[in-house]
Amino acid sequence: MQWIDEGLVIGLRKHGETGVVLELMTLEHGRHLGLVHGGRSRRMQPMLQPGNTLRATWRARLDGALGSYAVEPLTLNASRLMDSGLALYGIGHLSTLLRLLPERDPHPALYEAAQVLIAHLDEPEIAPALMVRFELALLAGLGFGLDLSHCAATGANDALVYVSPKSGRAVSASAGEPFRDRLLALPPFLRDRDQPGSGWRTPDAHDVREGFTLTGYFLDQHVWRPRAQDTPEERARFVALGTGQR
């Protein structure tokens, strides 16, 4: 068995005296592990840092085996990001999120979204909002996507300012007003589909905090609580730095 793909490094662990088990989020083969012989050498260590993108050749005798990787660099982001606390916590949180995906289950759209996020993790003006959007995409990839396209009560697609914590569907201002204390806020940047260059506005810290509150609620309900886990520390630190909460 053999394939060649590109992959984002999301983790590694020691194996034997000189090797590592490398965990990649690949474009076409999903989250995939493999043994890298000599992965702990001085030559290999800089390449195998989380956040880097590699060209990987995976080989195994059987499809279900761990197999081994031969890797070469494509984009080495780790050295660029290591000077930013926001980026370091962002890489840690992104890796934790991607590990929620079933192993070897392809998610090419999530892979591409992760690459966009990695490219901007050291830009505090946009990285937090991109992370909120990635969390929404991950929820959808896990089968817990939110419907923010129209009001759950009226079917209208304007003045959407709330999300129902029960259904995960958007609610308009008028329909939600009597129940506003029981609804989650839907910040403008999550309901606006405009892209940079066509009237897009960078969300402020308040909007981003509301976005993280929204995604955090559903991640807790559907992901962390069923696994008896707390909110990852990397997420808490990233949110604090990204929204001006020291």
UniProtKB/Swiss-Prot annotation:
GO cellular component assignments: bacterial nucleoid
Keywords recorded for this protein, A-Z: DNA damage, DNA recombination, DNA repair
Keyword DNA damage: yes
Pfam families: RecO_C, RecO_N
Keyword DNA repair: yes
GO BP annotations, alphabetical order: DNA recombination; double-strand break repair
SUPFAM superfamilies reported for this sequence: ArfGap/RecO-like zinc finger, Nucleic acid-binding proteins
InterPro entries: ARFGAP/RecO, DNA_rep/recomb_RecO_N, NA-bd_OB-fold, RecO, RecO_C
Protein family membership: Belongs to the RecO family.
Functional description taken from the UniProt entry: Involved in DNA repair and RecF pathway recombination.
Protein name: DNA repair protein RecO
Native source organism of the sequence: Methylorubrum populi (strain ATCC BAA-705 / NCIMB 13946 / BJ001)
